[in-house]
């Protein structure tokens, strides 16, 4: 369903009408005065050919109506495909509507991608951010199983408490656990760090991870169990936009809100699992990423960097019947996204 912002249309038309009045005043001494409670239109004519005015006024009024409608149409909502330029919660600054060329370009891409997502192999979410133009968009952005993508947020929480943790457990222990957790997706390392965050208590450690997510408005991300633990009572969840916004902060490095953004970036650059987003990209293309897998889940979140057009890309898929096909889908669509911008 599409919604029209009639307030925007009215104000656009008023601006057009004021400009029109100014033109008429200069050419014909035609005066229009507006008050808050009523509209008063006293007119003073000086050698005016009224037919001439009609020939000018009516087409201009029609043009104003068409222009205001076009303005409103350009601002319409896009349903589940949601491009935006900038984000008030991100390092990129304030909100901008989807009227820019960049967002139109992104909308075309999102439409293409949605048409290629599998319809018989699980549920899918996709996020794309043009890191140069600072525009982003998503398909089906909703809470889904995080698998090992929860480790991105464990990493964020650890670095936010880095000084305290290294003071208590030692820098070598914290750093080596971070490296193993991210580069080879070591579950034991993830559990060790979560325990560190809780002062030896895993429940409190998970609460610290969740507090980190809430404080940074990753509102659809939740750590409900330790890695390898049963998901009978709770599970780990995230969404593509939460992962994408964390990647944007990491990519920003010194301009980021995170003191250790460069350290996080370097860990992602050292990733050894390259079978999804990087798999079909040219050999010279650099990707910093983190994967996630369960029996019926295939996820990947990555930054394509040092390219003509750097990008952040996130794929989440769950309830899969064919995980191998899902890996190929992520690889193929990542290649399509890269080639679209580069």
Q: Where are the regions a protein language model picked out?
A:
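Mid-domain, small-residue-enriched loop/turn segments at the edges of structured enzyme/sensor domains
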Residues: 194-255
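Short, conserved catalytic-motif segment at the N-terminal edge
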Residues: 119-143, 163
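Structured C-terminal helix/loop/strand segments within mature extracytoplasmic catalytic/sensor domains
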Residues: 19, 40, 44-50, 54-59, ...
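A conserved catalytic-loop motif detector
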Residues: 233-293
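Active-site-proximal beta-strand/loop segments in catalytic clefts of secreted hydrolases
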Residues: 129-131, 181-186, 193-197, 224-228, ...
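Conserved catalytic neighborhood of penicillin-recognizing serine enzymes
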Residues: 164-209, 219
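Short, Lys/Arg-enriched N-terminal segments with co-localized hydrophobic residues
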Residues: 13-42
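Active-site SXXK
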Residues: 143-167, 181, 313
